[in-house]
Amino acid sequence: MIEISSDVIRGYNDTMILYILQKAPSYGYEISKSIKQISEEKYIIKETTLYSAFTRMEKNGYIESFVQDPGPDGNGKKRTYYRITDLGREYYKTKCEEWVLTKEVIERFV
């Protein structure tokens, strides 16, 4: 089976993460699982790639992080969750428009 090159998809990691965060706030492991599931296991994002994207997007104002305490029963651990901002929604829309154009151009060559 052919794997997707990380170089090819690198510019769209943010788009995939923002897509997931539009539905609801989430944390790293859950986002990673969602990307794997939605891509039908054709793309598995590396942990370092994921957390680098979180850092970059938070710095750019596309997402916000917050810590969620474990439930009232005390089970589990604190997790850092991420949520999309209005600026992140705008960025997502721009990246989707960019993808349509990119796909149109590349399809002329394959």
Placement of each model-derived feature along the sequence:
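Non-catalytic, surface-exposed connector residues within folded enzymatic/regulatory domains
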Residues: 11, 44, 75-76, 93
